Amino acid sequence: MQDRQKAQDYRALLLADTPLIDVRAPIEFEQGAMPGAINLPLMMDDERAAVGTCYKRQGADAALALGHRLVCGDIRQQRLEAWKAAYQRFPNGYLCCARGGQRSHIVQRWLQETGIDCPLIEGGYKALRQTAIQATWQLAQKPILLIGGCTGSGKTQLVRQQPNGVDLEGLARHRGSSFGRTLNPQLSQASFENKLAVELLKINARQTLKRWVLEDEGRTIGANHLPECLRERMAQAPIAVVEDPFALRLERLREEYFICMHHDFTHAYGDEAGWQAYSEYLHHGLFAIRRRLGLQRFAELTDTLDRALAEQLSSGSTDGHMAWLVPLLNEYYDPMYRYQLEKKAANIVFRGPWQDVANWLKAQ
């Protein structure tokens, strides 16, 4: 049987969606983790902080002794049971700490005492993180084609249909606009970058890749910003622009932001709390761009939004939302995107309705 005590083929681990039992403290995990990792800490945040302070003042031996005093008895047993359960659930998993040091080795030894031989990641999260950064830089050097178009043009759907398409907004859990958040919170910046790297590796591994197909994004998608190596390549990339009729764009936006988001909120929180969350979501989206709209126009559109919500609540109709969505597109989103697109006019290689762009992509 192959020795799995230590793993150094980091790309293979990432490509295989290898389960990781991440024994770092919760604060470390929240700052950055790999896709598929579960956080089962050896030490909680306060325990780690105390051990760190002890290390600085008294040295490594004293810090190690303190760690063993903090994680002993019932606490040790509870955490050991959690690691055992995780390994039984994921027998192909690996232990992972920050650098493949004391913490993962301690947990490995404790598990061995119970008869479980769980391998660990040599180099820990730091090694996996460096692999992800290097992979993104390397794969970003391949040719890129961008899909552009005004809000509601179906760009994301078009990207998702391409075998070489990378859904940046899906990875970021955000649709890019002030109304772009979803019910799933965004990942930390490092976790987003790690997830992007794994997606690039997977797509690249399953086909002969001529180029990436990406949506024309700004530097940020919600709270996440695109890696600079990718942004630099996107800035020079050719663009295919979707130009659909305004009415069709409105129907896409109605479905996505009013029908689907209302359904998602009520499904998650129940009718009453879900409606409140849905209303707050729309108000927050409008509030986020109040300065660009001007306070008077913002107040007018807010009143219109309130009336639309009242109509939707009483009758189920989303028609009232068009009274604030149409001017929002005409006065803010469309002029903003067209201005940005004009600066990249030399990069445009195709224009047309959604289906024409889809057909053009197939022919490339």
Swiss-Prot record:
GO molecular function per UniProt: transferase activity, transferring alkyl or aryl (other than methyl) groups; tRNA 2-selenouridine synthase activity
PANTHER family named among the record's database cross-references: TRNA 2-SELENOURIDINE SYNTHASE (PTHR30401:SF0)
One GO BP: tRNA wobble uridine modification
Quaternary context: Monomer.
Job of this protein: Involved in the post-transcriptional modification of the uridine at the wobble position (U34) of tRNA(Lys), tRNA(Glu) and tRNA(Gln). Catalyzes the conversion of 2-thiouridine (S2U-RNA) to 2-selenouridine (Se2U-RNA). Acts in a two-step process involving geranylation of 2-thiouridine (S2U) to S-geranyl-2-thiouridine (geS2U) and subsequent selenation of the latter derivative to 2-selenouridine (Se2U) in the tRNA chain.
Reaction catalysed by this enzyme: 5-methylaminomethyl-2-thiouridine(34) in tRNA + selenophosphate + (2E)-geranyl diphosphate + H2O + H(+) = 5-methylaminomethyl-2-selenouridine(34) in tRNA + (2E)-thiogeraniol + phosphate + diphosphate; 5-methylaminomethyl-2-thiouridine(34) in tRNA + (2E)-geranyl diphosphate = 5-methylaminomethyl-S-(2E)-geranyl-thiouridine(34) in tRNA + diphosphate; 5-methylaminomethyl-S-(2E)-geranyl-thiouridine(34) in tRNA + selenophosphate + H(+) = 5-methylaminomethyl-2-(Se-phospho)selenouridine(34) in tRNA + (2E)-thiogeraniol; 5-methylaminomethyl-2-(Se-phospho)selenouridine(34) in tRNA + H2O = 5-methylaminomethyl-2-selenouridine(34) in tRNA + phosphate
Pfam families given in the database record: Rhodanese (PF00581)
Family: Belongs to the SelU family.
Protein's name in the database: tRNA 2-selenouridine synthase
